[in-house]
């Protein structure tokens, strides 16, 4: 992990890898993130930058690699997946978060974008399946409950590598 982190640093900063922050633009060059539809959210969630520039320290980078490793538990993966999918960072997945999630998965082009009616129906179906307390949002425990019924979740989510 340290070798991968330091290889992404600009040439003059490699010797200070433990104390320097890796710019988001460099993080996004990782093959695992390059084509990932959630690449910007992943950087946001794992970055501890006070400037909110989504840069990462070595510790942030290590946290990201740990969560996406095969040895991370489903509970840890689901917590981070929830945070990645919570676009407005309010602690719940509401209709807008779900719409953003669907748009990330289907793409933004005209031919792949869902119609308004299709999007509304899909979000309604997701909420019917997941919103146990019927408050119109999905909280972390509801998300984890749905995930617990998906045996492939730990292998494929968060959808990174």
Roles of regions detected by a PLM:
Residues 8, 48-49, 83-87, 128-130:
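Calcium-binding motifs, dominated by EF-hand helix-loop-helix domains
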Residues 117-123:
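Mid-core helix/loop region of P-loop NTP-binding domains shared across ATPases and GTPases
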